[in-house]
Each structure stands twice: as C-alpha cells, then as structure tokens.
Amino acid sequence: MAEAAPMRVLVLDTVMDRGGAETMMMNYLRHFDREKITYDFLVNRDYRAAYEDEIEALGGRIYRMCPMYPQYFGRYKREFRAFLQQHPEYRIIHSNLEERSYFPLRIAAEQGVPVRIAHAHNRPVGFDLKSIFREYFRMRLPKYVTHMFACGTEAGDWLFGEKNRNKVIQQRNAIDTSAYRYDPSLAIKVRAEFGVTDPDTFVLGHVGRFFPQKNHTFLIDIFAEVHKQCPN
C-alpha cells in the first residue's frame, strides 16, 4: 500500500528572503515531519530569493504571482482565483501578508478553502497614503479568516482588532537555539574581524533594521545599564 502524500500548506508571502517572518516559516519547515506536512510558497516577486533553493531541497514548491501594489490589485485577484481553481489540493492557506491577506483569504473563502490563517507579524508606525489602504483591508479581513495568529498582543490588536483578542492565537516565533550557542572559536574570529584584541572586553552585538518596531531605544537603554557594570 502506497504511503499517503504529505499535507501541503500554501504559504503566502511577498518574497522568501531573510526577513523575520520568512525565517520563522523556514524554521518550522526545517523541523516538520515532512512526510506528514510541508509548506509550498506563493510569492509576489519574480526573482530567485535567498531561501528558495532550501525550500525546494526540503520538498517545497515555489509559485509566483504579480506584486500586490494598488495598480495590480485587480490582476492579483484574477490570478489568485485562477490559481486556486487549478490547485484544489490546498485546503490550508497561511498568509503572512498582513492587511493584504484580505484579498487572497476572501477569494479562498469564496472557493471553499476550509482553513484560512492570517498571521500578524507587525504593526505599522505613523501615517502615510498606504495607511488608507491598510485600514480598509484590515477592518474587513477578520470576516474571511478561520484562524488568527499573531506574534504578540499589539500586532494582533492592530490586524484583527481588540474585539477579537480572545480569538487570536499567540504564535511565538520559533528559534533553534542551538544555532546561537556560544562557540569560543567563532567568538575569537568575530572579535578579530571588528578589531577587538583585548580578551577582557565584553562585546554585545545586535542585528536589526533601524525601524521603530525594532525598539532600538530600549536596546540602547539596556546597553547603558550594561555599560555601567562593564565599562570596558
């Protein structure tokens, strides 16, 4: 008797480069029992991104569609509807498109896809012309979602509204801590790259975009307190 094929979840993302949400999804994919479940990705960029080779090596598939810019909204809706009609095997859709999840998940609901996940990874800061679209889409999104995921309370409140807080699943970002285990030989190499020759110098590092959501002011406050105790 032939073994059952794995359940294939369709993940919607802009591009599978090394962003936070994309890295989180890759961590899940790497640790799944891929004989039972796997991810396929529908992206909105036409270039080969950082994670695509690994996705395919792990058995995932990459599909491409037009960008989700305002001038392409009509085209995107037509193409996504046609895609679902051509791929009825997808019974679970996991969207990382924030408020833009409104488009594909509404179409997925119309096409009878039973599990439609919207995942909030962020909350916008400030107001610009895009904010008008964001507000329109996010207010209509919950109607077409079966499962609401969020990385934290603020992100969930923004995308789904505070009234839906009790429905939101706090999906904390999974991290393979073994990748960050202290390695003395690697530490020596990195310190040398930055010209830190004194072995008694305490070194702290941070990787992150200079955006408000990364909360650099809090990191600076922490560093100030650390520096008081370790002035070297």
Where are these regions (language model features)?
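N-terminal strand-loop element at the rim of the active site
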Residues: 3-7, 11-19, 23-75
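Short hydrophobic "strand-cap" motifs at the C-terminus of beta-strands
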Residues: 12-13, 151, 171, 206-210, ...
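A conserved mid-protein helix/loop that constitutes part of the nucleotide-sugar donor-binding site
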Residues: 19-27, 202, 206-225
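A conserved nucleotide-sugar
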Residues: 36-39, 198-201, 216-232
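Donor nucleotide-sugar binding/catalytic pocket of nucleotide-sugar-dependent glycosyltransferases
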Residues: 63, 143-186
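A short helix/loop element that forms part of the nucleotide-sugar donor recognition site in Leloir-type
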Residues: 80, 181-196
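Short His-centered aromatic/hydrophobic patch
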Residues: 95-101, 120
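A conserved, positively charged/aromatic
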Residues: 110, 117-151, 160-164
